[in-house]
Amino acid sequence: MQAASKAGHNVVVVGTQWGDEGKGKVVDWLTDHAAAVVRFQGGHNAGHTLVIKGKKTALQLIPSGVMRDGVACYIGNGVVVDPAHLLGEIERLEAAGVEVRSRLFISESCPLILPFHVEVDKAREALRESSGAGKIGTTGKGIGPAYEDKVARRALRVQDLKHPDRFAKKLRDLLELHNFVLQGFLKAEALEFPPIFDHAMNVAEQLKPMLADVGVRIHETNLAGGSVLFEGAQGTLLDIDHGTYPYVTSSNCVAGNAAAGSGVGPDKLHYILGITKAYTTRVGSGPFPTELPMDEPGTVGHHLSTVGQERGTVTGRPRRCGWLDAAAMKRSILINGLTGLCITKLDVLDGLTEIKMGVGYELDGRRIDILPLDADEIVACKPVYESFPGWTGSTVGTTRWDDLPLNARRYLERVQEVIGAPIDMVSTGPDREHTILLRHPYQG
């Protein structure tokens, strides 16, 4: 690990679209300059795919910095933790030769995801579908119900695992409530107390050595001159407050939550890097103004889907694909206060004869230049496009701006101009070395 260029200089990485922007690769690349990486929201519904020397590694809950020797990995209080999944992820990494337990620290304040959260999540989606209401598109991993318990002040937290009697009492009360919902409203089967409690006590013994006061550790890292990287999950347009509600996730995915979700002040967030695909994708339901049809071979949508290998890391579901939506990007820049952008998957556009970018919308006979807040209005939006000539040369693996095809550079320059934020990095392939650096987040 190289020394940080500026003592205590912290970087926040957030997705600016509907997730799957390629944050994992960028975080892994930036970790060269970080002493620690922090997850601050979401759960194991978030997939982070890293490709290192041609080998693909998929992470869901553990910070992407785990693939770098000597880097501390923190799971902040804003994350909901499924202990069984977490241990499974640890075991898979350690079986592959990655040391995890000595470097992973989990906030005691994290809410727990337990089996009844998963069952409620799945039963709700099934009920929505059968009633004709339409799915929200959750991953079915219990994330939403766990956050509901947190907000209702009844959640079991990681710290409760240290106190078996307290855990048992709270679990009985919580299980009674969720069984009432499962049986009475969702027409699903109730769960039994003993297996849930016994399993929790078993995993508790394995997790206890990794429990920590994450906020204090981050503060001490900065005081010692170390830099910290805050790794966001999902994307801004899935944020519970600022996304395309109700087709959103259950947490705040924006940069401001890096402070609240890890236990530090906002003054610790020095540089905000937004990750943006050179086009747009979305998994699951919800409005998507620049979406393209993908089924027909030879179409742009099919090209983006197949060349981009657009399937969800966690669910395996095909991602919906479309042109870059600069008007939606403007909303993300406004919310996050971005310092700079990293454009990913530029290489997927190689070979297209024409490239389009959504620069605004027509809504009820008027032109608007930023994504509306109302999901029904977004559905009614007709995108306004600018067109660009494509390029025939390959951008795969390019590491210098001047080596990009001229039309690729012109496209990126126009993206930068329309959205009003500087492009500081460009990703030209899945491997960490496939990166063009224009301004370093740890030096800018």
Curated annotation (Swiss-Prot):
Catalyzed reaction equations: IMP + L-aspartate + GTP = N(6)-(1,2-dicarboxyethyl)-AMP + GDP + phosphate + 2 H(+)
Pathway assigned in UniProt: Purine metabolism; AMP biosynthesis via de novo pathway; AMP from IMP: step 1/2
The EC number(s) this enzyme carries: 6.3.4.4
One record GO biological process: 'de novo' AMP biosynthetic process
Classification via PROSITE patterns: ADENYLOSUCCIN_SYN_1, ADENYLOSUCCIN_SYN_2
Residues reported to bind IMP: D20, E21, G22, K23, N45, A46, G47, H48, T139, R153, Q234, T249, R317
Primary localisation category: cytoplasm
A GO molecular-function descriptor: GTP binding
Positions annotated as active site in the UniProt record: D20 (proton acceptor), H48 (proton donor)
A GO CC term attached to the entry: cytoplasm
Binding positions (substrate): T313, V314, T315, G316, R317, P318, R319
Record's cofactor remark: Binds 1 Mg(2+) ion per subunit.
UniProt cross-references to InterPro entries, sorted A to Z: Adenylosuccin_syn_GTP-bd, Adenylosuccin_syn_Lys_AS, Adenylosuccinate_synth_dom1, Adenylosuccinate_synth_dom2, Adenylosuccinate_synth_dom3, Adenylosuccinate_synthetase, P-loop_NTPase
Pfam families: Adenylsucc_synt
UniProt xrefs under NCBIfam families: PRK01117.1, purA
HAMAP family: Adenylosucc_synth
Family to which the UniProt record says this protein belongs: Belongs to the adenylosuccinate synthetase family.
Protein name, UniProt field: Adenylosuccinate synthetase
Organism, scientific name: Methylibium petroleiphilum (strain ATCC BAA-1232 / LMG 22953 / PM1)
Lineage: Bacteria, Pseudomonadati, Pseudomonadota, Betaproteobacteria, Burkholderiales
